[in-house]
């Protein structure tokens, strides 16, 4: 076996090195300044400790703090420092697990007295002391038996349980930072000093061991960490903004919806919230019509035999709501379920009646109510519910039509997002997973088509980011995932386009080809909003409740200064309603500033104030949400202007095109 390895660098150059050379020595051989900046290195994309030997040939990269991959290392190391700090400050506390998560990390601790928010500043101070010590991260490999004995002697029963779950004979990695150590897969940076001080402990929460309510309750401490203070402060500012924009709070203030214990995870829509929901449905329905979809509706409750055929009963049953039928002897032994997805029902509609290749593509769409079980701890306002509405569509087409259909779907999705003000979109192609149906040849063709489509999208749209997610496709076919960025920089995955070879085959769906033979159609699953409830939650937070005039549930309030203007206010409101605007009249015997403030809190876009002078002159005083400016104009002028502004963007395009 050769003792040298061949390494290819990012600039394309290739050099030979001794296989036993470490990543740190490699960085040193390139330049001393790079060695000082290095926190890890990667070979063929796999991140390693700087202390690891090169071992094998491949593409090599030295990772510094500026590299996006360093962020996970920083957070991982900070979690370890958190655990050490807690055990220094609170002897007898057991450590359990502490993974990196989106935007930060957490660590779960077992302690008789749970931690509180008051403990966090003290723990943070100790963490900074540990980082200042700049102790190296060093790795040892232990046998399973040694690890179990050492953790048992330390009284770390949770670590013993983790070790027990590891297959016999498998060695374990133990990482030290000074004298403190933990069971960990790694990798880590070179020392605690490389973490820096750009971190913050955020909150505490209860968490059951292994997520099982039958197990002990632990205390989870959440934190975040960044490569520099600017990024940390930007993140903390974003959290402050997110709290102000929380759709659950705005939902209460704007009187849109509520949740209650008797219906966990399902929405009680109030009148204004339901109007907003219907505005979304109406807009999406018009967009469906303009893209050649046929709107259908499928049953809420279906026999389990259909779900067995579709495969849902086998792999999704635990997330489905089962229904027992009472009062009918013929149905006593049948098991039904609320549909978690609309796709099997759409296949049934496609199968109803003979289809020819001349009929394709057939586009079926549904605003389908679906139900999926989510643990109570995972429920989160409109963002995570148990009952919701999908803007679901399925295109049945030939393999040759697949590329054109995916491009049309992409145009449709992007134009919808643009109408709601989302300009920064990322599209990622998820490719074949290890467990999948269909031949490699079929996957090759499908992925080739979607790669071509992705490249066309990239060329046509300069502001669209694209990427590949290897192995993240559905088991039945590759898919596009659409992620949009909101007003405060958060990303939301919403739309999907998924190619499906599986479901048509399971249900025996076919069409008659040009050769008069039966052919299996390609089925493309398409969603734009995904969950319409969740999309509304995203919109509420993106606009901070200040919805565009065309989408607002109440567009105009006509408010009086004195009772002398009551009749004129009623007349003005009637004309505004006749013009198609959503109007509320406020004739209460309250001061006008009180009325304006109250309606502003409810995020009404426009308030038309009427006093005695306005009544005499047939004018209104217009005030807009978020502005102190006031503008006086005739009622007819106000109606004309507001009607123009309240025209939905799709209808405005039609009007301008005509």
UniProtKB/Swiss-Prot annotation:
**EC?**
6.1.1.3
* Pfam families in the record: HGTP_anticodon, TGS, tRNA-synt_2b, tRNA_SAD
Q: Which GO terms describe its cellular component?
A: cytosol
- Compartmental location: Cytoplasm
Keywords in alphabetical order: Aminoacyl-tRNA synthetase, ATP-binding, Cytoplasm, Ligase, Metal-binding, Nucleotide-binding, Protein biosynthesis, RNA-binding, tRNA-binding, Zinc
Q: Where does Zn(2+) bind?
A: 343, 394, 525
The answer to keyword Nucleotide-binding applying to this record is yes
SUPFAM superfamilies noted in UniProt: Class II aaRS ABD-related, Class II aaRS and biotin synthetases, TGS-like, ThrRS/AlaRS common domain
Q: Which cofactor does it need?
A: Zn(2+)
Catalysed transformations (reactions): tRNA(Thr) + L-threonine + ATP = L-threonyl-tRNA(Thr) + AMP + diphosphate + H(+)
SMART domains referenced in this protein's UniProt entry, alphabetically: tRNA_SAD
Alphabetized GO MF terms: ATP binding; metal ion binding; threonine-tRNA ligase activity; tRNA binding
Which residues does the annotated region (Catalytic) include?
A: 246-548
Q: Where is the TGS domain?
A: 1-64
Cofactor binding annotation: Binds 1 zinc ion per subunit.
Q: What InterPro entries would the database entry show?
A: aa-tRNA-synt_IIb, aa-tRNA-synth_II, aa-tRNA-synth_II/BPL/LPL, Anticodon-bd, Anticodon-bd_dom_sf, Beta-grasp_dom_sf, TGS, TGS-like
Name the family: Belongs to the class-II aminoacyl-tRNA synthetase family.
Q: What's this protein's function?
A: Catalyzes the attachment of threonine to tRNA(Thr) in a two-step reaction: L-threonine is first activated by ATP to form Thr-AMP and then transferred to the acceptor end of tRNA(Thr). Also edits incorrectly charged L-seryl-tRNA(Thr).
Know the name of this protein?
Threonine--tRNA ligase
Tell me what organism the protein belongs to.
Answer: Brucella melitensis biotype 2 (strain ATCC 23457)
Name of the gene this protein is made from: thrS
């Amino acid at each position: 076996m050769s003792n040298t390895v061949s390494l290819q660098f990012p600039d394309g150059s290739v050099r030979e090195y001794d296989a036993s050379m470490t990543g740190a020595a490699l960085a040193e051989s390139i330049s001393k300044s790079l060695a000082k900046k290095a926190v890890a290195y990667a070979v063929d994309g796999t991140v390693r400790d700087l202390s690891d030997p090169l071992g094998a040939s491949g593409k090599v990269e030295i990772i510094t703090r500026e590299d996006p991959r360093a962020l996970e290392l920083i957070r991982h190391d900070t979690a370890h420092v958190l655990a050490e700090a807690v055990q220094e400050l609170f002897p007898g506390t057991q450590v359990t697990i502490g993974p990196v998560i989106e935007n930060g990390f957490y660590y779960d601790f077992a302690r008789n007295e749970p931690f509180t928010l008051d403990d966090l500043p003290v723990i943070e101070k100790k963490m900074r002391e540990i980082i200042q010590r700049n102790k190296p991260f060093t790795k040892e490999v232990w046998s399973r038996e040694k690890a179990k004995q050492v953790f048992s002697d330390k009284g770390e029963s949770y670590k013993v349980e983790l070790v027990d779950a590891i297959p016999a004979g498998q060695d374990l990695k133990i990482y030290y930072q000074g004298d403190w150590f933990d069971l960990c897969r790694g990798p880590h940076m070179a020392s605690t000093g490389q973490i820096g001080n750009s971190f913050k402990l955020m909150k505490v929460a209860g968490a059951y061991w292994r997520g099982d309510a039958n197990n002990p309750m632990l205390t989870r401490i959440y934190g975040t960490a960044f490569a520099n203070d600017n990024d940390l402060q930007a993140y903390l500012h974003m959290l402050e903004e997110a709290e102000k924009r929380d759709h659950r709070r705005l939902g209460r203030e704007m009187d849109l919806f509520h949740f209650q214990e008797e219906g966990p995870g399902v929405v009680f829509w109030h009148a204004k919230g339901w109007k907003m929901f219907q505005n979304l449905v109406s807009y999406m329905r018009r967009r469906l019509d303009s893209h050649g979809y046929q709107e259908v509706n499928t049953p809420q409750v279906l026999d389990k035999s259909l779900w067995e055929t579709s495969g849902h009963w086998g792999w999704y049953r635990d997330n489905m709501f089962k229904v027992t039928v009472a009062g009918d002897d013929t149905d006593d032994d049948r098991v039904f379920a609320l549909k978690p997805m609309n796709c099997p029902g759409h296949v049934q509609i496609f199968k109803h009646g003979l289809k020819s290749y001349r009929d394709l593509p057939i586009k079926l769409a549904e605003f389908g109510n679906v139900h999926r079980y989510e643990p109570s701890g995972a429920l989160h306002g409109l963002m995570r519910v148990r009952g919701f509405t999908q803007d679901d569509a399925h295109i049945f087409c030939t393999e040759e039509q697949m590329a054109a259909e995916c491009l049309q779907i992409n145009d449709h999705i992007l134009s919808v997002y643009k109408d709601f003000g989302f300009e920064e979109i990322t599209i990622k192609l998820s490719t074949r997973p290890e467990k999948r149906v269909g031949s490699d040849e079929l996957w090759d063709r499908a992925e080739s088509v979607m790669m071509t489509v992705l490249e066309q999208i990239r060329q046509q749209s300069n502001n669209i980011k694209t990427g590949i997610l290897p192995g993240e496709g559905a088991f039945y076919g590759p898919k596009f995932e659409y992620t949009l960025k909101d007003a405060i920089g958060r990303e939301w995955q919403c739309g999907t386009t998924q190619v499906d070879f599986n479901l048509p085959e399971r249900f025996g769906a076919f069409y008659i080809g040009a050769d008069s033979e039966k052919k299996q159609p390609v089925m493309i699953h398409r969603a734009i909003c995904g969950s319409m409830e969740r999309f509304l939650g995203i919109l509420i937070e993106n606009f901070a409740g200040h919805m565009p005039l065309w989408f607002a549930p109440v567009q105009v309030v006509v408010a009086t200064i004195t009772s002398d203007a009551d009749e004129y206010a009623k007349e003005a409101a009637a004309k505004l309603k006749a013009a198609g605007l959503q109007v509320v009249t406020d004739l209460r015997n309250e001061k006008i500033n009180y009325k304006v403030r109250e309606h502003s809190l409810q995020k009404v876009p426009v308030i038309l104030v009427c006093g005695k002078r306005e009544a005499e002159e047939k004018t209104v005083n217009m005030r807009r949400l978020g502005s102190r400016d006031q503008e006086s104009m005739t009622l007819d002028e106000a109606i004309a202007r507001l009607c123009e502004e309240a025209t939905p963007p799709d209808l405005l395009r039609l009007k301008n095109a005509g």
